[in-house]
């Protein structure tokens, strides 16, 4: 009889360990930091970025530490970063649900439309904690005029790192650092592209 209880306890412990190892911990990439916005140097244009509800609801799962995984919503979390990057360059920024409505774009005075594609990845060098210690976020934007003709493309990447001792309950720290760098680089790439002035 003790053998049966011992076997049952061992099986339960193995099942629990397997279940915990396979879970995905939620984190967020939203950053409070934005590039500086100097009204005297803003391009006097109204621009838009495209973000659909389906994109905002898209959940992604990537690697964390100790065999665990992390889950987050890249479009929802990075929407503020994209908007902040555009607001650092242009006078007026709006959001569209679709890029294809040329008449509405022209009527609204939109001169450029940014359609972003986001890719992310994470990893961890830690075997004792689950938060990612390395995070990469990349945004690639196709930029069109109000009628839908492609003007140019811009790309930006942000890499973030965080060590175990830095987390202090802030488990998405590496992701937020990546988002902050992505925002600054996207703003810089837009500003130096002559086709986007």
Residues covered by each model-derived region:
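Mid-chain, structured segments of secreted extracytoplasmic proteins
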Residues: 76-102
């Amino acid at each position: 009889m003790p053998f049966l209880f011992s076997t049952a306890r061992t099986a339960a412990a193995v099942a629990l360990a397997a279940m915990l190892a396979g879970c995905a911990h939620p984190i967020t990439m939203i950053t409070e930091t934005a590039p500086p916005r100097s009204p005297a140097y803003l391009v006097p244009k109204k621009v838009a970025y495209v973000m659909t509800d389906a994109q905002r609801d898209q959940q992604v799962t990537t690697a964390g530490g100790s065999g665990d995984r992390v889950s987050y919503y890249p479009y929802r979390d990075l929407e503020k970063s994209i908007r902040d990057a555009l607001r650092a360059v242009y006078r007026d920024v709006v959001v569209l649900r679709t890029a294809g409505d040329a008449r509405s774009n022209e009527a609204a005075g939109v001169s450029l439309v940014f359609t972003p594609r986001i890719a992310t990845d994470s990893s961890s060098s830690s075997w004792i904690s689950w938060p990612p210690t390395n995070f990469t976020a990349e945004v690639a934007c196709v930029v069109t005029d109000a009628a839908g003709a492609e003007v140019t493309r811009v790309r930006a990447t942000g890499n973030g790192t965080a060590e175990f001792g830095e987390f202090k309950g802030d488990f998405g720290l590496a992701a937020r650092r990546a988002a902050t760098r992505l925002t600054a680089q996207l703003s810089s790439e837009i500003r130096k592209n002559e086709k986007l002035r």
